[in-house]
Amino acid sequence: MKKLSLLVSAITAGIFTTAQADISVSGSSTIAYQSADSNNNSAHGGAVSFALSTTTDSGMTVSSGAGITLSASSTGAARTVSGFQNITFATGGTTVVLGNDVGVPDGVGDVGGVVGDIAALNNNGMSSTVGITDDEGTGMSLTTTFGSATVGLYYVADSASTSKALGDIDGATETGTGAKFTTTVGDVGVTLGYATYEDSSADDEETGIALTYAAMGGTLSVGYENSTGTNDGNQAGVSYAMTLDAATVSIGFSSADMTASSSTQTDVAVSYPLGGGVSVFAEMRSVSGDTGTDTSSTSNSTMAIGSSITF
């Protein structure tokens, strides 16, 4: 990483002599053992991320990013190149994002999930949960601060454009909107979210609220969300995270009451840092009620033990 950083610094110093540009490179890797009853697997993946930014003469920061990823939780394990979909402009407490991968603020009340994607691999999952059909695409977002509050407005003109270079702004048939408000009331953090998705056959809406509070040496989070349209129902969740010595322990619980199903999910996660960007983790997820179809390779209870490294 040190040699890579020095190389990138040398190259960018030569190219951007007059501009106030910055290019940073980071990497990560994960290796784990994953189990779903009798289906036992190894999972190995990693990513390299590039963050690019520059500052105009007026002080506005313009940034973008890209990455190369091999997902440890993907059954296909295909290497992907991501990024260069959005450009971010930030100045004076206001941030504007333009691009083909702008997301609306859905999932605000979903606080019960505390495990990573590897522990969730091959889990049957809750059969139905709150959500909208699609939450990103070609569009823009504007976020600004008012004292201790942050307000965000989101518009997606073409939800079918992600991973493409072009978005169909005037002829798109899939659109989305949203708003998000974050503030503190006393010692309680409050986040409100609203998101919509609409196409020729769907008219989805989702609202959510999340509250956070420092309690008993940790952080307690409580959330609630409701959606109508394709996924009609309510979902509530609670999670608690605390540090014991250097270890971080998180427990989460979610309950979904949908039109045709009802299910619960319980998560437990423990991680311990070893220094130098290396940590070990153990995670477990269990679902009950109306779950996904059980097969020889899936289970209502799954777990993962492994190590994650950041470079």
Write out the residue ranges for each language-model feature:
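Outer-membrane beta-barrel proteins
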Residues: M1-F311
